Amino acid sequence: MCPSSFVLVIRLWFPPLTGAIVNGTTSKLTRTQRRIAIVEFIFATLFFLPKTADQIQAAFLDYDVPERPLNDWQKEIVKVFSERCVEFIELIENQQQRNQAEVQSKYNKVSGKKVDLLTKAVILCALSEQHAQATDKPLLISEALLIMDHYSQVPEKKQTHALLDKLL
């Protein structure tokens, strides 16, 4: 079976982390590793939107490999993401505009920086998990920032924290 385009984008974009998880010494994945897998999937999905909820969920099942099996917890988060991604993306964009307006009025400067796709993917994962599970807000923020440490630099991490703090 040929891997879906989602999996190809993920493997091309995230080779160091994906390899680290797949080639790990244990077959038991931590919750952080499972969240990273969801973030990677959501990140890849953002390139192919719009998709229906069924298409997104079916694509996530293609992501299920023996080295990194999916569990029900991950499937539930992706289910919520697939059903509410448009709503969540609008929430993120609206909150970022409010944050920029706040910065502009506070410091009299214009910050035209858009939310990058990785930040958006991390936030979408956190919002989806919050709606799928009864998860503690500080835990989600700390996990999201831990995931950002793998890929991102300080400004993106600060932007992620500012958005999550107001959205969760």
Curated annotation (Swiss-Prot):
SUPFAM superfamilies: NusB-like. This is Uncharacterized protein MG027 homolog. The lineage of its organism: Bacteria, Bacillati, Mycoplasmatota, Mycoplasmoidales, Mycoplasmoidaceae. It comes from Mycoplasma pneumoniae (strain ATCC 29342 / M129 / Subtype 1). InterPro entries: DUF1948, NusB-like_sf. Pfam families: DUF1948 (PF09185).
